[in-house]
Amino acid sequence: MVRLRLPSATCLLGLTWATLALQSRGFGAFSVVKPGGIDDVLVTEDNTMTGTFHGNKTRVVHQHRNARRADDQAALTLELVNLYNAKQTINAYVTGLDGSNRVVFVRADGSMVYPSSGGSETPVLIKESVAIPLTNSSQRMPLPTALYGGRVWFAEGPLQFYMVKTPCGDGMVQPSVMNLRDPSAAINWSFAELTYTRERSVFANISYVDFVGLILSMALKQRNNRGTQSIRGLDTDAVTKICSGMIDQSDTDGFPWSRLCVADDTGTPIRVLSPNSYGTINPGDFGQYWDGYVDRVWEQYRQTPLVINTQSAAGQVECRVSPNNTLLCGGGDNRGYDKPSAHDIWGCNSGPFERLPDDNGVHVAVIPRLCAAFVRSTLLLSGGDVQPRLNASHYYRDASASHYSRLIHELELEGRGYAFPYDDVNPEGEADASGVVASGEPETLTVYVGVPPK
């Protein structure tokens, strides 16, 4: 790798001129990782998968071919393909909760590792071999168990996972993009999300809600000639291009968008954080970002109605800002909406967008549509008085917008892949913007890392 000094021709091997130019532009503008040790591991709700306690020792369960039931032939096959670099080994990991809610790793031979914290209330490194090394050929493997909240990870080096005792049992502490001191912080990695149910239905997606890292694509082949679903994701050099766009945006509006780019100690960007993830590190940097836009929205809909198409039995509901400065919606919506903060808009799950247990169906339907309208900054456009109505060509046009989401969708090869939690809110008749594949009759789920397949 090249540090920021005049490089020799030898040092340029493996680096593009675009990357070197970006290093120079981003010097001092990017967030920089400083990986630490086990004492720097943070245990948070965001990076801990909580399962039931199964014992004080790690267990390995091997699948014996002769002992499989006949119906196991219908189990899902997982195929992992390295298109990143034929000369470089990529480590894959398959994690999740099994049908009994226990943390599990699935290895290449179909064996399952059930790690244990041993009752430790401080994180304990998982030392068992759980990585699946990928060279220039694909790895096909059975998925012998239901997997809930699953992830298929890919990394340029070894990722470190930990176990810790929790009030509910045993929890797995996963690498965190929100901790610049995480032991795995300097490694370029990414994951696809996967749920495989006891009934053998599969739901998988490529998401950029938290960050953009290694580039992933996926395909789901279905049984009984039901065809193949595919998601091609982002272009290969998306991280470099997004970071270049972030620097430009910082120059335009003065907000530290470039800080969303996370670089290693050479200045090379390895991932881009979402505004919501970045807010965990530096909550004040975008604290007032949306204030002006929200004020303008509130003033407009104090005078004229905002219509939310719930796309449900409730149909369209009319909303208006009340004298006490709360947005109130009709149709039986059980409570109003206060002005959202930047934190509320980035995450779509706090403040006026938080779902409470007693919220009725109308309120639950309004939340995602209202938050999506803010993130995409469509509320003040002509035609934006009905949400959702405008198509994707109108998104992110206002100066106040999620430029993280904008750049992602500009670089997606097919325009699909979540860039924020409610990116699946679409006007009726418009293409699905989410990066989801799903089937009740799955045969093979293929996940690619690197160059998107044709």
Predicted regions and their residues:
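Fungal secretory targeting signals
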Residues: 1-33
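Extracellular low-complexity, O-glycosylation-prone Ser/Thr/Pro/Gly-rich "stalks"
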Residues: 22-454
